[in-house]
Each structure stands twice: as C-alpha cells, then as structure tokens.
C-alpha cells in the first residue's frame, strides 16, 4: 500500500516511513470494495477523505431522467476523490462514488487536516500543505472541463478532450470508453459514436478496442 501512496500528490515529498506514521497518527483505514459497490452515496455525510490505492472509481451524478453523468474517473493510484465536500463543511455528498472494478480505498478522517497533533510532526504539516496544492490543481481541472463542454459542436468537444487529455502516437489518446466519454461530455452515446465514426472516416481519429488514437494532433487543432 505504501508504494502506491508514494506517488500520490497528497503524500508528495514524504518518505515511506513518514507515510506509515501519518496513517497511524490519523487512524486511516484501508477498505476493499467489489465492482459496482458504493464507496459513498449521494446524501451520505462527508467525514473522511478518500484515496485510491488500487482499482478504479467513478464519481457520478444522476439526472432527473435517470441518466448518469460521470463527474470524475479515478484511475491513478494515490488519486483523491470527494475531497471538496469533505472540506467545504457540506452536510452531505451531492454525488456518489462507485467502484468501477474491484478496488482498495484509503479513508482518512477529516479532523486530521484541521489541527496538528501534540507531537508537532513535520509530515503532518506537509500533508496539509499538499492538500492545498491539490485543491489548486482541481480548480485547474474543472476549468479545463468547462472549456471542453462549452465548445459549440460535438466534434469540437471530442477534439478538445482528446487534445487536453491525450497524446498523438502509438498509445490510446484517452482511457475512457465511449459510455464514460459520453457522460463526461454530457452527450448521448449514439451521437458520440456516430461522430467518432465520421471522424475516423476522415482520418482524424482511429477507434479500436484498445481506445481512441490520434494520428495527427495538428488536424484536430484545426477543428477548434
């Protein structure tokens, strides 16, 4: 578990020993979740910070017509989710988090971030400073998403998300499947699939079972 957390932005600049001490001091808990199991539900009280150890998590919101919208896809070990509600003092979550695959999650009590312990541990202060840096990065991410969904056409939205989150070359430009991508862009999946096929026919993208590839990023930029 410690090896997975070393790359987490929450524990940046900390040694393995520092992380172990931090987890003991905070009374953090590691919990396993099965695929599709709820990690927290909409309406639950946000009392603990959640960190992905391994697996993948979808943070979602359901519209009034029952359509699911993915707020965030958590796939990288050490990544946080639900922290905004934990530190805003909200009485309940407005979203829900669900394990996309069998996953292990670290839960750290919220109170640990509001005061330093009697030992005045350096790693405790470092953890709080890292949390502030994470909030700044999250604000930047949300700004990127707003720019993507604000694009005038579906083709522009697709081009924008591929350019923002992917790279041209041998690897897939994006790890989302079509359903997740449609949820992220807030569009119907059939509409997304049709546009992707048209873009593939024009040589703008290559759609395979492995993911969506970008042969030429410059061609995509001309769409914007």
Predicted features and spans:
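Basic, amphipathic alpha-helical hairpins
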Residues: 116-121, 142, 165-171
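Phosphate-/nucleic-acid-contacting segments
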Residues: 152-154, 161-224
């Amino acid at each position: 578990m410690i090896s997975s957390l070393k790359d987490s932005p929450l524990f940046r600049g900390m040694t393995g020993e520092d992380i172990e001490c931090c987890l003991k001091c905070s009374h953090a808990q590691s919990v396993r979740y099965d695929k599709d199991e709820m990690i927290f539900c909409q309406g639950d009280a946000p009392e603990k910070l959640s960190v992905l150890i391994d697996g993948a998590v979808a943070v979602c919101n359901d519209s009034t017509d029952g359509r699911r919208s993915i707020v965030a896809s958590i796939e990288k070990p050490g990544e946080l989710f639900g922290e905004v509600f934990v530190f805003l003092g909200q009485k309940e979550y407005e979203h829900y988090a669900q394990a996309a695959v069998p996953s292990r999650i670290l839960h750290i009590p919220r109170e640990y971030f509001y005061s330093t312990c009697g030992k005045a541990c350096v790693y405790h202060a470092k953890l709080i400073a890292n949390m502030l840096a994470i909030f700044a990065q999250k604000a930047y991410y949300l700004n990127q998403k707003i720019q993507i969904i604000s694009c005038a056409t579906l083709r522009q939205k697709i081009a924008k998300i591929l350019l923002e989150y992917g790279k041209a070359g041998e690897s897939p430009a994006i790890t989302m499947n079509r359903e997740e991508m449609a949820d992220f862009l807030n569009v119907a999946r059939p509409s997304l699939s049709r546009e992707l096929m048209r873009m593939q026919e024009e040589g703008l993208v290559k759609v395979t079972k492995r993911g969506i590839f970008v042969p030429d990023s410059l061609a995509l930029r001309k769409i914007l």
